[in-house]
Swiss-Prot record:
GO terms for biological process: starch catabolic process; starch metabolic process. Changing D231A: Abolished binding to starch. Residues 1-19 form the signal peptide. The lineage of its organism: Bacteria, Pseudomonadati, Bacteroidota, Bacteroidia, Bacteroidales. A lipid is attached at C20 (S-diacylglycerol cysteine). Belongs to the SusF family. It comes from Bacteroides thetaiotaomicron (strain ATCC 29148 / DSM 2079 / JCM 5827 / CCUG 10774 / NCTC 10582 / VPI-5482 / E50). This is Outer membrane protein SusF. Residues 275-383 are annotated as: Carbohydrate binding module (CBM) 2.
Length: 485
């Protein structure tokens, strides 16, 4: 059986002006009673309006016609009402409907919603999928929901300023408002359109972004300023404006990271503080009691030269719960975070247990954690440990290959065991979290000294430890010991 809606008297009264009202109204919250059974499903067919391909650089009208009701199976004489118009599933927009059922929207609002939907001001043709929530009231007064099709149109935002080949600078309270004090932003290594400035400031500050072409010695061409459409914008994440640009406010002090995306024309301001140490405690470690005890707070290893990132190999029993902290005590601690990949959740059965990170599947895991400001990432991966270098499967010609993997024990007190060395030479061992490139394996390497696992962490090259053909490495991550024999 199909469904229809029976509307209240208040909704019926509204229909008299909804079909022909030219004012821009936002009817995103229709009033209705619960649906009841109906003998048939009524439909509405919509088509794109005459303004189905909008280019903002060429547009001159204040409003545009984006859709039209072309037909309906509602009873003849029914009055049609539209309750909401939604773009790309999540964005409602004010609209008007003419007497011949043409839907009009303000062009400026449509442009703004398009940019918000794609989080971008880039002058790229964007598809907008329009869903129209429509109803019919029959001559007998019955209100029935209409099922309609989706309509697609396109909009291309206005052209943004060209990327300055010489980059961008920050000028503001914490630099000084002159050209000589401007601080250059660094181009991101992976995104040629992303520019970054890391700074440490004493108090919240206003700033603007300038292309290099705007700075000539101590002089600044203020007409080229980039900022926010709202002066003093402290949102931390918004679009960049190039006309009448207002100042952006950091809303933070201390270590901050300012980013400017010169393609999408967005900025971010983030807390850039990061711990130099990280510890894990939990149900298997007496929940951090006593403070400072290495058996209650398990230290993770820094990823060499990589701010705020750590790793460790740990055994978890089923349903163990853990938290992390930047010291071997409570304070600024965290457990389950949103930035855990589905792959990690599936591998280890990870879940949120009252804010704690719960591990549902017992076993050994390589745990990778990144903490920079409020941005926290936790990943659980297979505990792959590799033999590297002279003694490995094919020396330096084959790295991080299956033939160099250590075996993984099935118990918490078991040993990881390497393949037998194929020749004499310096022994090198590493893990390789997915966030660390294969070529940077040395950032997560370690060796054995005097029967103990010695992690490189943020240190330099470790002293060479020699191995002989046929020997193996034995590692006990549970108690931190190891041997070569």
């Amino acid at each position: 059986m199909k469904k229809h809606l029976i509307y209240t008297g208040m909704f019926l009264a509204a229909i008299g002006f909804s079909a022909c009202n030219e004012d821009f109204k936002d009817w995103a919250d229709p009033q209705s009673n619960p649906q009841e059974e109906s003998a048939g499903q009524l439909t509405a067919t919509f088509t794109a309006g005459k303004d189905a391909s909008i280019v903002m650089d060429a547009a001159t009208a204040d409003s545009v016609e984006i859709a039209k009701l072309s037909s309906t199976t509602a009873e003849e004489g029914s009055k049609i009402a539209v309750n909401s118009l939604t773009l790309n599933e999540n964005h409602t927009i004010p609209f008007s409907m003419t007497e011949d059922h043409v839907f009009k929207v303000a062009l400026a609002q449509l442009d703004s919603v398009t940019q918000e939907a794609y989080k971008s001001r880039a002058s790229v043709v964007r598809e907008l999928k329009i869903s129209i929530n429509a109803s019919a009231v029959t001559p007998s007064g019955e209100g029935i929901q209409l099922v309609g099709n989706e309509v697609s149109i396109t909009l291309q935002p206005a052209t943004t300023p060209a990327v300055d080949p010489d980059g961008y600078y920050i000028v503001g309270d914490f630099t000084g408002w002159d050209g000589n004090s401007a601080q250059q932003m660094k181009k991101d290594a992976l995104d040629e359109n992303l520019y970054i400035l890391e700074a440490e400031i004493e108090s919240t500050s206003n700033f603007k972004i300038f292309p290099a072409s705007a700075i000539n010695g101590n002089d600044i061409d203020w007409t080229k300023a980039l900022g926010s459409s709202v002066d003093g914008d402290d949102s931390g994440d918004n679009f960049v404006s190039w006309t009448n640009a207002g100042a952006i406010n950091t809303a933070l002090d201390g270590k901050i990271k300012i980013s400017f995306d010169a393609f999408n024309y967005r900025f971010t301001v983030k807390d850039n503080s990061a711990p130099t140490e990280l510890y894990m405690t939990g149900s298997a470690y007496n929940w951090g009691t006593p403070a400072g005890d290495p058996n209650a707070w398990k230290a993770l290893v820094p990823v060499n030269g990589t701010k705020g990132t750590f790793w460790g190999i740990f055994y978890f029993a089923a349903n163990d719960q853990v938290k992390f902290a930047p010291q071997a005590n409570w304070g600024n601690d965290f457990g389950f975070v949103d930035a855990i990949s589905q792959e990690s959740k599936d591998l280890a059965g990870l879940s949120d247990e009252g804010g704690n990170l719960k591990v549902g599947i017992a076993g050994w895991y390589l745990v990778y954690v990144s903490v920079i400001g409020d941005d926290k990432v936790i990943e659980f991966e297979k505990p792959n440990v590799y033999l590297m270098g002279d003694t490995s499967y094919n020396g330096w010609d084959a790295q991080l290959v299956e033939q160099d993997l250590f075996t993984v024990p099935g118990t918490a007190d078991g040993e990881f065991v390497s393949p037998a060395f194929l020749k004499d030479g310096a022994v090198r061992i590493c893990v390789n979290p997915k966030a660390v490139s294969a070529g940077d394996w040395w950032k997560t390497e370690f060796i054995i000294f005097d029967g103990q696992i010695a992690y490189r962490g943020n240190g330099g090259d470790q002293a060479a430890v020699q191995g002989k053909t046929g020997q193996k490495v034995y590692l006990n991550f549970g108690n931190g010991t190891g041997r070569i024999e």
